[in-house]
UniProtKB/Swiss-Prot annotation:
GO terms for molecular function: glutaminase activity; imidazoleglycerol-phosphate synthase activity; lyase activity. The keyword Lyase applies. Keywords: Amino-acid biosynthesis, Cytoplasm, Glutamine amidotransferase, Histidine biosynthesis, Hydrolase, Lyase. It catalyses: 5-[(5-phospho-1-deoxy-D-ribulos-1-ylimino)methylamino]-1-(5-phospho-beta-D-ribosyl)imidazole-4-carboxamide + L-glutamine = D-erythro-1-(imidazol-4-yl)glycerol 3-phosphate + 5-amino-1-(5-phospho-beta-D-ribosyl)imidazole-4-carboxamide + L-glutamate + H(+); L-glutamine + H2O = L-glutamate + NH4(+). It is found in: Cytoplasm. InterPro entries: Class_I_gatase-like (IPR029062), GATASE (IPR017926), Imidazole-glycPsynth_HisH (IPR010139). This is Imidazole glycerol phosphate synthase subunit HisH. Residues 2-197 form the Glutamine amidotransferase type-1 domain. The gene is hisH. Pathway: Amino-acid biosynthesis; L-histidine biosynthesis; L-histidine from 5-phospho-alpha-D-ribose 1-diphosphate: step 5/9. The lineage of its organism: Bacteria, Pseudomonadati, Pseudomonadota, Gammaproteobacteria, Enterobacterales. Heterodimer of HisH and HisF. The active site is at residues 77, 179, 181.
Length: 197
């Protein structure tokens, strides 16, 4: 299977590549639109700011490439957030706009520290193939200060002061707010499920 990990310059690419390798799959780290378009599965990991990620995607001519995709793509953490229409980060950033009418906001909770860092539960519907063989008691590893509120594309939610989207899907575009590659067996199972969709 051809698996591409998008190199936005704003992510730890090694950890996701190692996690995929442990599942028995090879992947390629690339920012070449022609390779991305030919890949069967695509990962868009992201760490840092929406502004930096969008600048890199523009610079590498990947915005239109991403919008053309019909094969499954998984945005991880910031990768999911930039699928929204707009981020209030960095005084406002227009993002890719896959999840229409969805906006990324600062996680506002008066008595909890930011970033939201550590292990937390996700509340999901077992029937979705992304959650196959994942127990509802499992926890996943989060590191973020911005969220996408609950919306029509939300597949799973998490509470940290407020409830927010921790897994989203629109057609072939999937997103997770947590880091499956750092989430132990449950994260590995979710990656496996995505690769088998």
């Amino acid at each position: 299977m051809d698996i591409a990990i998008l190199n936005t310059g704003c992510a730890n690419l090694t950890s996701i590549q190692v996690a995929i390798k442990k599942l028995g799959y090879d992947s390629i780290v690339t920012s070449d639109p022609s390779i991305v378009l030919k890949s069967k599965k695509i990962f868009l990991p992201g760490v840092g700011t929406a502004l930096a990620a969008m600048e890199q995607l523009h610079k590498k001519n990947l915005i239109n490439t991403l919008k053309k995709l019909t094969q499954p793509i998984l945005g991880i953490c910031l990768g999911m957030q930039i699928f929204s229409q707009f981020s209030e980060e960095c005084k406002g950033v227009k993002t890719i706009g896959i999840f229409d009418n969805c906006f990324t906001h600062l996680l506002k909770s008066s008595n909890l520290p930011l970033p939201h860092m550590g292990w937390n539960h996700i509340v999901f519907n077992n029937l979705h193939p992304l959650f196959k063989n994942i127990d509802k008691k499992e926890r996943f590893y989060f590191v973020h200060s911005y969220i996408i509120p609950l919306n029509k594309y939300t597949l799973a939610k998490t509470k940290y002061g407020v409830s927010f989207s921790s897994v989203m899907q629109k057609n072939n575009f999937f997103g997770v707010q947590f880091h499956p590659e750092k989430s132990g067996d449950a994260g590995a199972q979710l990656l496996k499920n995505f690769l088998e969709i």
